[in-house]
Regions:
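A near-ubiquitous, low-amplitude feature marking generic local secondary-structure context
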Residues: 16, 45, 70, 74, ...
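Solvent-exposed, acidic/flexible segments
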Residues: 19, 77-84, 164, 168, ...
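Active-site-proximal helices and loops of the catalytic beta/alpha 8
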Residues: 28-31, 38, 47, 52, ...
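Acidic/aromatic-lined carbohydrate-recognition and catalytic surfaces
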Residues: 1-154, 193-221
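Glycan-binding loop/region signatures in secreted carbohydrate-active enzymes
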Residues: 6, 109-170, 236-263, 328-348
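Alpha-helical context
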Residues: 17, 67, 78, 138, ...
């Protein structure tokens, strides 16, 4: 399915000394990104926000992508509209799709207060953007005559009423504009618990037209909750849809944090249901860090264990920018980093998953392969010394070659193995590490 790169982190323009030039920085890294095997970029919100130096999750003018002088300046914190379009075109030329982050739950930075006659309260709900597109007043927000409340608010920011005909039609028109005019290929929906899944479904059923060709947008939703709640949201958003949306696998992320940081974590817990990857693999977007969890609950130790897991199992894996570029986990010149795992994912990680062995300290899984991808075997080792076991793989009389590996204080390459006539082989991994074997 490919590998997504989250191409930002919180306050990245300030941290990288490229305020209002983040799009240009991403463009400069495109050769490395494409060479590594990434297939898509997830960008931060591109709209003009309430604050000039804002990550965009407080949207003010959806159609101002860095073109109008308002809220402190012309460009967004990430750059100008021209820079954004140039980045998208360059990404397409490099073979990458680009996903926009849609913040459709709330707005911020209103130009004037208004009295809402339904509850008699004044709010900043008058929006007069310089783009002159999608101006809003109190009738666009909760409470309205169409709906008093729809899920969850975000702080004290005005909460959009998607049942209001103007809001519904404008948001769909905006999504189509991003696809057809700006060049995006899909969306990440922010805070989907704040509004009805039917709104997402309406957008996903769009057939965008670009360069004479129609296409369906990809999409993933941020439903930060339990597996059951995420599943309920997916059922609602995808009911009768011919273009289903996926969801970030937050329950799996918490397991991966415990795998990396909790002493005594039982590897057998990785094989338990209750995460999207096992229960709804076609809709699971797996991840290790993102711009939110890394600030409040980061993974501190042995993070490559988590990346080895998501880049060998089913789901659509998403790699975090800081892990790849800032914290030296790419390791492009050896087999002990994210780059080697991406290569394995793109060349071998296909077909159903099958756990061959699991106990508290050892986990062995194989992918059965599909088409021209021949599958793989993953060994995770929780011990402080080399560890392995005999397992029966799908390959008979086949040489299994280590393609990616890493261990704590031990980067020695696992030995090549041969399966016998019944597919049995003795597969090992380094101390507190992993080994990925592929058929030669």
């Amino acid at each position: 399915m490919g590998v997504m790169l989250q191409a930002f982190y919180w306050d990245c323009p300030r941290a990288e000394n490229c305020e209002h030039h983040w799009w240009g920085l991403i463009k400069s890294r495109l050769p490395l990104i494409a060479q590594a095997g990434f297939t898509a970029l997830w960008l931060p919100p591109v709209n003009k926000a309430a604050g000039w130096k804002s990550m965009g999750y407080d949207p003010y003018d959806y159609y101002d992508l860095g073109e109008f002088d308002q809220k402190g300046g012309v460009p967004t914190w990430f750059g100008s509209k021209a820079d954004l379009v140039d980045l998208i075109e360059s990404a397409h030329a490099a073979g990458l799709q680009v996903y926009a982050d849609l913040v459709f739950n709330h707005n911020s930075g209103g130009d004037a207060q208004e009295l809402n006659p339904i509850d008699g309260r004044s709010r900043w709900t008058r929006f007069e953007p310089k783009s002159a597109k999608f101006p809003r007043d109190w009738k666009c927000f909760h409470p309205s005559r169409y709906e008093t409340w729809d899920g969850a608010t975000f702080g004290d920011m005005p909460d959009l009423c998607h049942r209001a005909p103007l809001v519904y039609t404008e948001l769909i028109s905006y999504a189509r504009w991003l696809l057809e005019e700006i060049g995006f290929d899909g969306f990440r929906y922010d805070m989907v618990k704040g509004y009805g899944g039917w709104m997402v479904r309406s957008i996903q059923e769009l057939r965008a037209l670009r360069d004479g060709t129609t296409f369906k947008p990809y999409a993933v939703g941020e439903c930060w909750d339990s597996e059951r709640t995420i599943g309920d949201w997916l059922d609602e958003a995808n009911a009768w849809s011919d273009n289903p949306v996926g969801a970030f696998d937050f329950p799996l992320r918490w397991r991966l944090r415990d795998l990396c940081d909790s002493y005594g974590f039982r590897l057998r817990d990785l094989a338990e249901r209750g995460v999207l990857m096992w229960d709804r693999p076609a809709q699971a977007v797996t991840f290790v860090e993102n711009h939110d969890v890394v600030r409040d609950s980061p993974i501190i130790n042995d993070k490559l264990l988590a990346y080895a897991f998501i880049l060998t199992h089913e789901g659509y894996p998403c790699v975090f920018w800081q892990d790849y570029f800032n914290w030296n986990l790419a390791q492009p010149d050896n087999q002990s980093g994210i780059d080697a795992l991406i290569k394995v994912h793109e060349q071998n990680a296909a077909g159903p998953m099958q756990v061959l062995f699991v106990d508290n300290d050892l986990y062995v899984m194989q992918r059965l392969g599909a088409g021209d991808q021949n599958g793989l075997a993953l060994v995770l080792n929780n011990r402080g010394s080399w560890n392995g076991t005999w397992v029966q793989t799908r390959w008979n009389n086949t040489r299994l070659v280590p393609a990616a590996w890493a261990g704590r204080d031990d980067l020695n390459m696992p030995h090549e193995k041969w399966t016998n006539e019944s597919g049995w082989a003795d597969l090992w991994a380094p101390p507190r590490g992993y080994g990925v074997y592929i058929p030669a």
